[in-house]
């Protein structure tokens, strides 16, 4: 009995980790196990008070607690061969560039950090994008090392059991959840990813408790433009394209049922496990060094923002405005001007939401222009407006008066402009 009863810090349940003389098919303590334990203590020690025995089991388990993921990671020894850079190419045919390397490395370090420091800040979702049958879900399952540490059962966030479905899992796949989400649910997903803990009560507990997150989330999509159109950026979602025809090892082939290949299937599966284990060992080496951050560098963030556009619907209005600005010779513009001249609403007045959309495009999708907050005078019919000014290179001539027209003296007097301005005119 010594050392057999332990609390599993990943599942927050009691495990029996040694054979105790009766049939068991899972380490987790069950009602049948409790009956056997009661019988054991009665026959060997004459103890018959059920509550005291169960309380003693809980205390012993807590004194002998363990974390299976941390134990697995601590036991790894890296052999020095770099695998993180090539892993997604090996199994899914992805590129081996710096972006793909940084994306997977960040995801692995986030998973390690969540195991050793539950509740640490990590809100990034690695999203694998490619056709059906590419092996995206199988990759996340393989990455979790132990199938019990993986789950793809999280289908919707308004499920009352959503937190219970996270319990005991290290890597959770959210398949197609982003692709089928609307604007409101996307914000819910972002908020969900940003949380560091949940407060809830598991069965048989009297009081709810804070449960710090020990898991990370992976996403998969068969649809290329799965990201919502968000000009401010979708920094939580890190997409990586997969090309299964370029993969060196196709995960799904290891699971074919043909008997003549079953031995080879298991050999390949074991080789894949060894590869994944060594990749985790490489990530642990980085983690132990302490020389990492759970976020991208500014340069990689800039690349991510540009890269994400390949996974968003076409932004036609931004395209119209960019085309207009390329042909426009003036040095300042305002939102009403862009509404009428760039978007072609010659006779309409813009609604507030349309002006906000133009502001969003200019502030997040356009380069070479910066906003100014003090209103300036524009040609008729725009008059006095806030807007944007062109950012000039040092070698460019100053055309800052472009787009202005002379205001008559009578109109300047009506506007109440300073008298010295009138004299200058």
Annotate each PLM feature:
Residues 286-330:
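Conserved alpha/beta core segments of nucleic-acid transaction machinery
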């Amino acid at each position: 009995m010594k050392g057999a009863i332990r609390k599993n810090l990943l599942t927050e349940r009691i495990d029996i980790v040694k054979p105790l003389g009766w049939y068991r098919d899972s380490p987790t303590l069950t009602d049948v196990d409790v009956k056997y334990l009661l019988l054991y203590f009665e026959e060997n020690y004459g103890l018959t008070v059920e509550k005291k025995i169960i309380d003693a089991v809980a205390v012993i388990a807590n004194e002998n607690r363990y974390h299976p993921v941390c134990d697995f990671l601590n036991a790894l020894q890296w052999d020095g061969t770099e695998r993180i850079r090539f892993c997604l190419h090996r199994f899914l045919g992805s590129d081996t560039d710096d972006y793909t390397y940084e994306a997977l490395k960040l995801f692995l370090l986030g998973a390690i950090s969540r195991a050793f420091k539950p509740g640490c800040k990590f809100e990034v979702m690695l999203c694998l994008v490619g056709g059906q049958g590419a092996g995206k879900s199988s990759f996340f399952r393989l990455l979790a090392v132990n199938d019990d540490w993986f789950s793809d059962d999280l289908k919707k966030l308004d499920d009352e059991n959503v937190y219970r479905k996270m319990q005991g899992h290290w890597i959770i796949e959210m398949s197609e959840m982003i692709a089928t989400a609307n604007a409101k649910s996307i914000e819910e997903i972002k908020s969900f990813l940003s949380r560091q803990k949940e407060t809830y009560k598991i069965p048989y507990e009297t009081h709810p408790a804070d449960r710090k997150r020990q898991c990370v989330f992976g996403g998969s999509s068969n649809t290329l433009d799965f990201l919502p159109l968000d000009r401010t950026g979708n920094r939580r979602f890190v997409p990586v394209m997969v090309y299964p025809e370029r993969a060196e090892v196709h995960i799904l082939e290891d699971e074919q049922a043909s008997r003549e290949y079953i031995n080879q299937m298991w050999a390949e599966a074991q080789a894949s496990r060894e590869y994944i284990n060594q990749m985790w060992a490489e990530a642990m080496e980085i983690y132990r060094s302490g020389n990492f951050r759970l976020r991208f560098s500014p340069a990689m963030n800039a690349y991510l923002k540009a890269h994400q556009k390949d996974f968003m619907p076409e932004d036609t209005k931004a395209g119209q405005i960019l085309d207009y600005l390329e042909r426009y010779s003036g040095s300042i513009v305002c939102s009403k001007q862009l509404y009428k001249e760039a978007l072609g609403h010659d006779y309409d007045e813009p609604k507030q939401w349309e002006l906000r959309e133009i502001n969003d495009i200019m502030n997040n999708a356009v380069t070479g222009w910066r906003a100014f907050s003090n209103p300036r005078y524009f040609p008729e019919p725009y008059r006095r407006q806030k807007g944007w000014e062109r950012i000039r290179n040092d070698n460019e001539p100053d055309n800052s008066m472009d787009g202005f027209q002379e205001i008559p003296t009578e109109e300047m007097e009506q506007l109440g402009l300073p008298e010295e301005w009138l004299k200058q005119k």
